[in-house]
Swiss-Prot record:
Disulphide-bonded residues: none
Top-level division of the source organism's lineage: Bacteria
Cofactor note: Binds 1 potassium ion per subunit.
Name used for this protein in its record: tRNA modification GTPase MnmE
Originating species: Rhizorhabdus wittichii (strain DSM 6014 / CCUG 31198 / JCM 15750 / NBRC 105917 / EY 4224 / RW1)
């Protein structure tokens, strides 16, 4: 059966040789063009004329010429990378060009005229790595997160998963589940249908140990807080200094500040990185009773919803009215007198008083909401599949009937396959690899 056409490129096939600019848009000091597929070696032969192909995995300076006429295109560093030990698992080549627009365009155009070559679609190099088994779905997702990472915490988490932290555990679990299933099948095969021997204690102990490891992974924190930021809501009555404090934390004028009460009527969000950790700061409408303004009433209602969904609430108001668990801030400390004993912090966004202490407090609170050193946060997809794996192992452990134990182990294998992407749907894969840029 021929390879299926690719979703984003009508008529294209997964057996084509693909190429793309994989470095930043020119002009630049160097432009890197990647080629992957069965014709990668032929492509560099055509661009370099009759010269012998470079030694594998050694950079070689070569003149690149247009196959149609022989005009010199550039003098470039060329890398020949025969598969399968490459990023995509296929034959690959890299051209390190002078990074001008005209040079890059000329080389890409020359490649496009070679038979069997076509431009890559978004994420196609990574998809080929997945389809050849060089990476699994978790590593592909982590690579997408790494490319999107804007903070140190996001980078660290992506690197843990891209480095195979979860994938290694899954490979081990799959081996152990298969081993247990094989032992069980052998016992069933060599037993009379009406006289199946009970499972031996060693079998149950191995199953329990596996379940305990899965339980630990199921307890990992969600990655969404790392991706979207720790939600910090600034709340309190009108004119309490919420917008001024948000602007100071964000380092920009994200919210309008005036002496007029009720200036902020809707939620104003400002993403910010503090100490390498992502936060999502939210300014809210001033809370008070008896407003006759319908628009302001909607803003107050939304403020209440934001407070309920917050990870951290900074309360700028009467300490006695502070929501449970909130940080009581005595704001505008350069102009107002506060009872320091009733507040957690006294700050002034204008003078900077207490701002370092506030940032330190936010980082301390965030540390309890984010994964610890060496622990990876997991996506909703990963957590759901781990839950299914845990349920399957629970079935296998609770049922004394070997037939039902075998069914639990079968469901466990299916859950592991879903985690690694062996049982992924095309729509889900298309959505993932569409997050990548062309050339990755």
């Amino acid at each position: 059966m021929p390879p299926a056409p690719l979703e984003n490129s009508p008529g294209a096939s997964a057996s084509d040789t693909i190429f793309a600019l994989s470095s930043g848009a020119p002009p630049a000091g160097v432009a890197v063009v990647r080629i992957s597929g069965p014709m990668a070696g032929v492509a560099i032969d055509r661009l370099t004329g009759s010269r012998p192909r470079p030694a594998a995995r050694r950079a070689s300076l070569r003149a690149l010429t247009n196959p149609d006429g022989g005009a010199l295109l550039d003098r470039a560093l060329l890398l020949w990378l025969p598969g399968p030990g490459t990023a995509t698992g296929e034959d690959m080549a890299e051209l390190h060009l002078h990074g001008g627009r005209a040079v890059t365009a000329a080389v890409l155009a020359a490649l496009g005229r070679l038979p069997g070559l076509r431009p890559a679609t978004a994420g196609e190099f990574t998809r080929r790595a997945f389809e050849t088994g060089r990476i699994d779905l978790n590593e592909a997702e982590a690579l997408a997160d790494l490319l999107a990472a804007e903070t140190e915490a996001q980078r660290r988490n992506a690197m843990l998963l891209a480095g195979g932290a979860l994938s290694r555990a899954l490979e081990d679990w799959q081996h152990r589940v298969l081993s247990l299933a094989a032992r069980l099948e052998a016992q069933l095969d060599f037993s009379d249908e009406e006289d199946v021997a009970p499972l031996d204690p060693g079998f149950a102990a191995e199953l329990a140990a596996l379940d305990a490891e899965v339980v630990r992974w199921r307890g990992r924190l969600p990655v969404e807080r790392l991706r979207d930021g720790v939600r910090v809501v600034l709340a309190g009555p009108p004119n309490a200094g919420k917008s001024t404090l948000l602007n100071a934390l964000a380092g920009r004028e994200a919210a309008i500040v005036t002496p007029i009460a009720g200036t902020t009527r809707d939620l104003i969000e400002a993403p910010v990185a503090l100490g390498g950790i992502p936060f999502l700061l939210t300014d809210t409408a001033g809370l008070h009773e008896g407003t006759g303004d319908a628009v302001e009433a909607i803003g107050i209602d939304r403020a209440g919803q934001a407070i309920a969904a917050a990870d951290i609430v900074l309360w700028l108001g009467d300490p006695g009215c502070a929501p449970a668990g909130s940080v009581r801030i005595g704001a505008q400390a350069d102009r107002r007198t506060h009872d320091s004993a009733a507040h957690d912090l006294l700050v002034s966004a204008r003078s900077g008083t207490g701002m370092d202490d506030l940032v330190a407090l936010l980082l301390d609170r965030a540390a309890g909401l984010l994964p610890g050193e060496g622990e990876a946060a997991l996506s909703a997809r990963q957590r759901a599949a781990l839950d299914r794996l845990g349920e399957a192992l629970a079935l296998a452990r609770e049922e004394g009937d070997p037939i039902l134990v075998a069914e639990g182990l079968r469901l466990a294998r299916a859950a592991i396959d879903a985690l690694t992407g062996r049982a992924g749907t095309e729509d889900m894969l298309d959505g993932l690899f569409g997050r990548f840029c062309i050339g990755k």
